Structures are given as structure tokens and as C-alpha cells.
Amino acid sequence: MKKTQQKEIENVTNITGVRQIELWRRDDLQHPRLDEVAEEVPVALVYNGISHVVMMASPKDLEYFALGFSLSEGIIESPRDIFGMDVVPSCNGLEVQIELSSRRFMGLKERRRALAGRTGCGVCGVEQLNDIGKPVQPLPFTQTFDLNKLDDALRHLNDFQPVGQLTGCTHAAAWMLPSGELVGGHEDVGRHVALDKLLGRRSQEGESWQQGAVLVSSRASYEMVQKSAMCGVEILFAVSAATTLAVEVAERCNLTLVGFCKPGRATVYTHPQRLVHN
């Protein structure tokens, strides 16, 4: 086979974020075959012409990512602080060019950091270790959730991972109503980016998405807890386990953290008073 045929082949699917390449199976190393692989590209968030952060992400729903990141990192207080947004190609990836209000941009410049993150790295941009786990306003206790509604949501979480279904390479974050219905979700190669996309989407949906909880397909790290709390999410469900720092942050900011979510199973780490199980 020619070398040119061994290179990455142009995407032939209709799903953004997937590309076909040639690969070899263990039981047949003589004959390459085509398979789908998830795309991962550098995405720079550029505020008022200044690059603030570079994250590795899936090249889809980037406006929601930029909005959610801006909210969960405290760069903005509400979507109204952003006057405009454009996604444009750059030499090695993509840029999300964000027009920020003067007041919020002045605050950003005071703590700006230039960095390049790993895939969805939640510590990226932290200048000092003391900045990790920064205080978050304690959440109110306005939400409740019936754990009997969780199983059906878990069965439908994969519906929001079309790239993941093809490649086995993405995380998902979805918004779950008190009824257990998943009304929207996003996926990404980075779990933090998937969550930021969801939080950005939620900020645009209004009252219909205010009641409910976040369900993620990944583990619950402290960054996932802190991002959720920064955006007013009171309940976070994770398919995998939580870390000790995630539990500490959740306890401190009054977030109900639930891990090991499988049909018929869930482990509640903090603030179980929001949950019922009839």
C-alpha cells in the first residue's frame, strides 16, 4: 500500500469530531482497515484579542464550551458579560474569539495566565497551589432528586455520545430533570470540557434547565465539583468514583455528590438530604 494511503484519510462521516484512519488489528497485522477515531484539537480561548488558555478538545459545540468555561472559571458572572463570539481556524487548531465586557476584561487581566492544557485539565491556569480549591459560595438547598429516576437516565446517557459510540473515546455530561429525563447533553474527549459545554448550554436554556442535576459519564474530580458549584448546580451524579478532594470541596460548598452510578446502585458522598429513595 502506498504511503499516501497510510496517512489520515479525510472524514467521511457526517459527525463532527470523527475522522477515519487506517489501523491494524492484533489478529491481522497484514491488512489495514478503516476505523473511526475521535478528533482532538487545540482550542484557544481569546478574550478581547488576548489568548487566555489553550485546551485540547473535540471540535464541536465550542461556543458552549467557551461560555461554560467563562462561567465556571469566574471570568464572567452571566452570559450578558459576553458581547460576541466567533470560532475561527488558526494555524494549528481553532480559536474562540470572545468579546468581553470592559469590566470583566479588567478583572481577567489582573489574574491572566498564559498556558497550554492537557486534555480538559482542570488545574490548567492555576498559578499557585493555594489557588486550587478556591472558595465557592455555599450552595442553597433548593433541589431534591428521587434516586428511583436515575436508572432510566443512565440508560439514555449514551444517546448524547454519537462520537463516543463510534470511537469509544469521549466523555458525556447531561442535564437531568427531576423526572429523570435527560433534556440535553454534550460530549468531548476531555471530561472537563464536556461539562463546560453543558454548563454553557444550561446558561442559555433559562428556567427549564434550572431544576435538576448534572450526570457525567466520568469520575468526579474536584474540578468537576468546583465547576458545577460555580454555576449553581446543587447535585452532581458521576458514573465512576469521586476523589478525596472532590468530596472535600463538595462538602464545603454544599453540593450533593453521588458516584458509582449504575442501574440499581449509587454511592452518596455528601449532603444526602437532597435525595429521596422511595
From Swiss-Prot:
The keyword Cytoplasm applies. Mo-bis(molybdopterin guanine dinucleotide) binds at F260, C261, K262, P263, G264, R265. It comes from the Bacteria. One of its GO terms (biological process) is Mo-molybdopterin cofactor biosynthetic process. The active site is at C121 (cysteine persulfide intermediate). Gene3D superfamilies: 3.10.20.10, Cytidine Deaminase, domain 2. It is found in: Cytoplasm. InterPro entries: Cytidine_deaminase-like, FdhD. The keyword Cytoplasm applies. GO terms for cellular component: cytoplasm. Its main location: cytoplasm. GO terms for molecular function: sulfur carrier activity; sulfurtransferase activity. Keywords: Cytoplasm, Molybdenum cofactor biosynthesis. Required for formate dehydrogenase (FDH) activity. Acts as a sulfur carrier protein that transfers sulfur from IscS to the molybdenum cofactor prior to its insertion into FDH. Belongs to the FdhD family. NCBIfam families: fdhD_narQ. This is Sulfur carrier protein FdhD. It comes from Escherichia coli O127:H6 (strain E2348/69 / EPEC).
